Amino acid sequence: MKLHLMLLAVLLCCVTLPSRAADKPNIVVILVDDMGFSDIGSYGGEISTPNLDALAKNGLRFSNFYNTARCCPTRASLMTGLYSHQAGVGHMTEDRGLPGYSGRLNDKSVTFAEALKPAGYFTAMTGKWHVGQNLGAVPWERGFDRSLNAAAGGFFFQDSPRAKVFLNGVEASSDGVSLPKQWYSTDLWTQYGLRFIDEARAKKQPFLLYLAHNAPHFPLQAPPEDIARWRGKFKAGWDKLRAARYQRQIKMGLIDKRWPLSSRAADVPAWDSLTPQQQERYDHMMAIYAATMERMDKAIGDLVKGLQQRGELENTLILFMSDNGGNAESGVRGKLDGQNPGDAQSDVFVGECWATLNNTPFVRYKHYTDEGGIATPLIAYWPKGIAKARRGQIEAQPGHVIDIMATCLDVAGAAYPKEHKGKAITPLQGTSLRPAFAGKALNRTQPLFWEHEENRAVRDGNWKLVALANKPWRLYDLATDRTEQHDLAGTQPERVKTLVAQWDAWAARSQVLPLGGWRAEQKKGRKGEQAKGKLSQKTRFELKNGDTLERSESPSIAGRGFTITAKINAQKPDGVIVAQGGVAQGYALYLQGGKLVFALRRSNELYKATTTQNIVGAHEITAKVASDSVLSLIVDGTLAATGKAPGPLTTMPVDGLQVGNDTGGLVGAYGADNKFGGTIESVVIEVGP
């Protein structure tokens, strides 16, 4: 009898129980959008983020973790473990006819969902996808069993004009798809994430949940009661708040006191130089940003509570990070547009002034490969998998979003495939972060690399080489100068030469070249915006001062001539009358030093017609791009200036259109503070054949 009992005990110990809780961990990857390095409390911020701070206190904070500097490339790298160009998403979601710039996840990559499914995982995603849904790369065909997603974001409330959500591949407005009548996207992504987790539990499967918040990306929107709580909290201004964040970071051990706080950008004014009205405006826009952050933190708290209530928290690895640095895209002044800023119809950006606070203590912003553009928090939380002695500590080893796939595979006991659906797969580029959970060294054998919009960087150990587009390389010793204040390139030419050679070799093997491929002409014949008819078909646009059009609403001017007629009353010598596009393609009609300028930006080069006489007071102006690409300016019926471009625009500009300002990528040779000084009675644009 005793022998039988002993045998039974041995057999019970060897049986694999149907519950997944005994072995494979769950994995939750949380990506937020346009959040700076210092915005959350556990990285020095004053914005209330108690739930994230609790994860950091009981988990591990990485102080040298990186993204790719931009939305789409980071998502591609995070999901595939490849550099974004290798996955086909070297820039945004337009197909440029080049392997590294196809605008969609390619078939030489696998997502972490596709890699974890063979290991028995239930896979789900909620939130912002933005890796080529417009070109056919969709979550339900890239390994996710369940999904509730936005193709590219751009909204928070259900009544936003841009709100479009897909549930398991079916648009939410379609028959049979039911969402709450009223929702806020941050909460919606979390609610459905928990629903999908319940499906996994019912199937007794471990789960992967990829939760991609669109917060705090523009247009910044939040419930009014959330915004009201933050009004007046930022009137100390970016200078004092930035200094306070920096001191908290030093005290926390995130920042070495040897690294000086980077200087305020030259075009950002001192807070104390602003009028009370200007300070009120800036406080308002940052209150909206803080409200989106607070709501996002609360939703993460709801997710953690939901995992705890379901008995899943102990064996769930949670990874939290941002897709790029804080965003200065709207220029120095930011945007606070709409009758009720922060509601579904409004358009709010924090702008460059507050982005300097977001990215404390670093220089530059989203788009750039300086630390301000690529440094992100990474919080790792896993009660069962992170050593108790490590909890609450800071990990200084460098990491990159290419490491997320390797980490997921490692903790799940899954293998990275050599081929998928009959296609050879590009070898994994990242390394697992799991050794850091136990205080061990990462097994990294290669430097880390970056390229975005020709901004380049490589980090090998503590040495970082970085360059702006078309600018010389700069060298920094990050051990003593993480804030990139002292360029050593002139004193260490051999080190520069070695790092440049490493970057060149990486670029050649990783589909980065040709450099500038992101500006290549958009490929025809694919299911892109032009092929799908998503660009405006209108040929006449009647506009007024303050009007803003999204890209899809703007005049379709690629390969075509067009005419602008504007009635203005100029009271100041500078300012934009109308602009469409940005630094690669577009046009702008503006005053500069009293002269009227009509500029065409074609493939990054600027071609202009400029009047010799000053323009003051009331005038009717006509600016024209003829079919032979001659630029002409007519003032009150008289030809005033001409110019010549080598041809029409090669592709539709990425940025939309604005009347009276240019707050996106700057088309003309003017600064970010370019609001028109005077009145604009009307602007009419007519597009030719």
What is the role of each PLM region?
Residues 1-7:
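Bacterial N-terminal signal peptides that target proteins for export
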Residues 2, 21-469, 473, 482-501, ...:
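Formylglycine-dependent sulfatase
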Residues 11-13:
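Repetitive helical segments and hydrophobic/amphipathic motifs
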Residues 16-18:
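N-terminal signal peptide c-region/cleavage motif recognized by signal peptidases
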Residues 380-381, 459, 477, 567, ...:
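Short, well-ordered beta-strand micro-motif
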Residues 468-470, 478, 601, 636:
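Surface loops and adjacent helix of pleckstrin homology
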Residues 523-689:
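Extracellular glycan-associated modules
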